[in-house]
Amino acid sequence: MTTAYAAAQTTEKKQSLAIIDSDVHPYMENGLATLVPYMSTAWQKRIGSGLGGGHTVASQFHLPLDYLYINSSGGMRADTARPGMSPATDPAFTAAQLLDGAGIDRAILLAGHLLGLGAMPDPQVAATIASAYNDWMCERWLQFDQRYRGGLVIAPQDPELAVKEIDRMSDRPGIVEIFMPLHEILMGEKHYYPIYEAAQRHGLPICVHPSGTENVYARAPRMAGTPTYYIEWHALLGQIHQANTASLLCHGVFERFPELKVVIAEGGIAWIAELAWKLDADWHGLRDEIPWVKRHPSDYLNENMRFTTQPFVEPPKREHLTSLMDMINAEKVLMFSSDYPHWNYNDPTNALAGLPEELQRRIMFDNPREFYGDRIN
């Protein structure tokens, strides 16, 4: 246990938490090479212990990411890096800038470099990387400052391996959820049922997030066509979340796993209302097709699913925002997220400005506290 971590334990605030940030991305200082010490010798050899040096096939191996769509300003805020380092690679700097600077009391970590892990073709390689990352995250971040909380990463390609990793990591201090990088298979399919059973058994929510590999890799999530520009791609990421939400609801996943909780991160929120209304209306006329869905789909959505705020909607007319919050039942289903250190970061001091104070408190604190339970404390 580090000195900083021990000190943080003794000086923990006694008052209520102010802000829980549901989407913060730590990055590995040397990319995949950072994880080499956390792999067996056999896996180091298979993946390529050089990882970036030389010109062998193994040394050129890299994690699936979007290298085709260009954000000319960069995907990261330049000020999120300590001089000489990359953004969000130093837990001390991030703690000073985000936790202290923005008043964040808990930050839930979602692996920045592993967002696209679900697109990797070899399930064993993906599972090995996920396992190594989890050990690194616990040692490098969770032990440094007790305000950090972790999403343990699983590789969705092989549910059996994913369940083993959930069982291995679920009781580690600071773990509050399972981060499941998205895959080509929609989330309602039976492929994921062993993962859902393990998540329910351990009382861990499952969080999904845009992968950064959409329409780029064969096994990545797919949009309805391939966008030309970054702005198109970025604006349409909600398509993936809408498809997965409908899949979860129509396949009756929450009837089969009534205690399962799912977090939909960084995919917009305005679509929640229309999708819920449409599914409820169609359910009345088409429920014979899906008899396992016993109640209105929106009932399951409101009880078992939560949605993070970033990128928060900014309608030209502010009064429309108030109406939207009511339409989507924001006082129950929304959880604040900053998306630190990305370029479209939402500052908690002004992201929800204009909303009633009680609603801000529910989104920033009460909703995630109730959803994550004792693990967040």
Regions found by a protein language model. Name each.
Residues 1-377:
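Helix-coil boundary/capping segments in enzymes
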